Structures are given as C-alpha cells and as structure tokens.
Curated annotation (Swiss-Prot):
Metabolic or biological pathway, per its Swiss-Prot or TrEMBL entry: Cell wall biogenesis; peptidoglycan biosynthesis
Xref: Pfam families: Mur_ligase, Mur_ligase_C, Mur_ligase_M
EC number: 6.3.2.8
Subcellular localization, as worded in the UniProt entry: Cytoplasm
GO cellular component: cytoplasm
Catalyzed chemical reaction(s): UDP-N-acetyl-alpha-D-muramate + L-alanine + ATP = UDP-N-acetyl-alpha-D-muramoyl-L-alanine + ADP + phosphate + H(+)
Species this chain originates from: Escherichia fergusonii (strain ATCC 35469 / DSM 13698 / CCUG 18766 / IAM 14443 / JCM 21226 / LMG 7866 / NBRC 102419 / NCTC 12128 / CDC 0568-73)
Protein name: UDP-N-acetylmuramate--L-alanine ligase
Gene name of this polypeptide: murC
Amino acid sequence: MNTQQLAKLRYIVPEMRRVRHIHFVGIGGAGMGGIAEVLANEGYQISGSDLAPNPVTQQLTNLGATIYFNHRPENVRDASVVVVSSAISADNPEIVAAHEARIPVIRRAEMLAELMRFRHGIAIAGTHGKTTTTAMVSSIYAEAGLDPTFVNGGLVKAAGVHARLGHGRYLIAEADESDASFLHLQPMVAIVTNIEADHMDTYQGDFENLKQTFINFLHNLPFYGRAVMCVDDPVIRELLPRVGRQITTYGFSEDADVRVEDYQQIGPQGHFTLLRQDKEPLRVTLNAPGRHNALNAAAAVAVATEEGIEDDVILRALESFQGTGRRFDFLGEFPLNPVNGKSGTAMLVDDYGHHPTEVDATIKAARAGWPEKNLVMLFQPHRFTRTRDLYDDFANVLTQVDTLLMLEVYPAGESPIPGADSRSLCRTIRGRGKIDPILVSDPAKVAEMLAPVLTGNDLILVQGAGNIGKIARYLAEIKLKPQTSEDGQHD
C-alpha cells in the first residue's frame, strides 16, 4: 500500500494493515459486495467469487477487484483472509482450501465489525425496514457534511452504490439477524425497527431465542451508547425492560419519544409531523410512500437529533431522499395501446418485500397513494420454509390486491416442501373467494399473461426477493409488451 492508501486506514486497527489480500466467497451479494467495496477503496487487494455477474460484481471490477465466476480452490491462493457469506456451505471448495492452507475464514459480520472498531458505529437491525432506514440515516449524515461510511444491503440510489467509504468518523451499517452474525458488531447506536418470526431455522424454531438474540445484540452497546426502538412493535415494547441501555423510542404510539402524527400520503410522498421531547415539532415531507417509511424516517430523525444535526438539514435530506433499489422502486409508466390495445397506462413498481408484513406495507402504500388504480401484483414467494411457516399470513395479505399473478417459489437452495408451493397457495387464496390468482409456471410468459389483465389505469407491483427483480427490469425494458418469437423471449 502507498502512503495515501495507508492514510485511509486511520480507523483500522494497526495490525489490520498487515493484511494485503482479502477474498470474498459469494461476493455478488449486496451485503458482501458493500464491505468489499469499502475495503477496495481503503486500498486492499480484493478478489471474490460468485456464480454469475451482476451489478455488484461489475462495480467491484471497476474498482480493480478480481472476480471469479466459479468456486475453485485456486481462487483463494495468496489470500490473507477469506470472508464468507452465510449462504455459502462449509463444503465449498474455496473454504475447504482456505482451511487446508490455514487461511483465516471469517463471516461477513466479523469483517464489518473490524470496519466499525474505531469508528462511531450506527447499526440498523430488525425484521423489516433495515435497508431503507440505513439509507435515510446515511442521507441525513451526508447532508450534514459528516461524510459517513455506509454499508447497506440495498442500492442507495442517491449514491448509486451499496456502500461508500467516507472520511468522517461515522460508520452506518445494516445489521443482519438472519444468521445471528450481527452479534459480532459493537456499535455506539443501534436501531431496532421491529421483531417478527423470520429466519427461524437459525433460531431452532424458537421465537424466545430470536428475542434473546436481539437483547444480546443491544447489550453489545456500551453503557453510554443508545438503543433506538420502535415502540409500536409489541415484541419491542415487551423487551424494553431487558435492554439495560439508554433508549429512545419512536412510533405512532402516544408514549413514543419521537412520535409520528397527522400522517398523510399524496402520491409517492408522505407528509407528517414528528413530535420530539424538548424540541420543536418537525413538519416532514418524505420522498417515500407508506406509513412504514414514516416510521423508518422517525428512527433516522431520532438518531440525527441525538447527534445534534440541525432540523433544516434533516428536513432537506428527507424531502430529497431518493430511496433504495427494489424498495417501492418506480420503473416507469407505460401506455397500454401497444400492450393490449387499450387506452390508458400502467405504472410499474418493483419491491423486494418478501415477508407478509412487508408485502402488506407495500400494498397499503400503493392503495394510499393511488387509490383509484387497479392494483395488480406479480408475486414470487421466497423459500419453501418461509412459505410453509407463514402460509396463512401470505394467503390473507395477497387477497388485498385486485389481480394476483404468482410465480413458482424461489427456492434459495432449499428443497421443495409438500403444500408449501405456489400452486397450493393459489388454491388457498382462490378458496377465500375474493380473487382468482393466476399461476405463472414459466417466467418467460410473464408479459404474455400480464397483458390481458391490465385495464388502462393500473399499478403493477412486482414483489419478491428471488430473481423477480430481473423480471421487473425486463418488463420495463420491453414496456410491458408481450414479445413475439421475432422479438425474442426472456430467459
């Protein structure tokens, strides 16, 4: 490393400077790629492997990283340390080779903890809302001129990246509870947005285990640190006496320290008042729809207020907030005449939400902002275990749309579970008597099956965490028009 690169490492433990080459297995994931991006910008030699290129790997290649689109033992040659995604199995040939060569193998969160060690860490945890809240906190701190480092699980649209190396002392990071690895983090401030049953295989199916893990995470705060917690969530309210740290609560609840009042949504914007203890009320215009995003903003404001950031800076950042990739992501509005011969248009929105609570929040935001629209959802269930465990919740939530098209379950490496498939879920929803779902067994036929159900005054929600985001972008690319054999088909 040259002198300029070493100067960037002022927030790194001195011994970490002995590390030269960091290899990431599963580098194409947003969380992994974000950490790799920060380390690349700090001057480390970065390599990594994944199965296929994507925007994350392209960005890292642009920064000088070496990316392999395979998993081979020789990929870890000369690495000082190997960082692994929780999605990677222990028998991966690169992990096996690293162990044989006595190269340290660590999880993503351990490397994130190293980045946070000598910085003022702000960690955002919770079942839902982490990515957007992380982006909001980052936006406010950037607007205040504090030049934070951030590592997010989704694309921060204003920056065009998942992660950025700043020169300030703040590190703002999404904290992942899916594999309990957030216990490696020792932040100064921790936000917990909500706690619901998800990733229960990590917690042996025991919700009490999940709750205790969140408490353990908060106990990583120093006694002078602060927990910022959504008191609207009944589980969080139950856990407050066990936190044992300074707490700021937020929510719509009357007893919240930072309280959301008078919420109104007009199109894609939320308008509301934030009441804070011993502070002037803030009248907020938030450039993100839905009551759930008002809560995310309240969490960000609670942290920023505690830091002493001026109100006018906070308001500017929230009004100009550009959102995150695949979170109520507006992809365009398209005329329907070329699609199905009808007059009028259809709006196309892409959203990552894949838990019933998240899907419900997206539907409510769509209904509140565009109440007159025909609401069409293209949904892809994510994981057979989640579909099984939350089956009735999915069936209840998905009946709220006007038209539902459902893709097959995205397995994410899981084996099928009888009765936890899309055909069964469609049958159950049909039995409720409200809507008649359409099963889309062939993703190449999405546009063909979508066109006939569009009326000319539609809002299409493309919803899910699997590969459905690619389908959303494809629909935008073809402007919803079904492709003939001459046009070519989406694979």
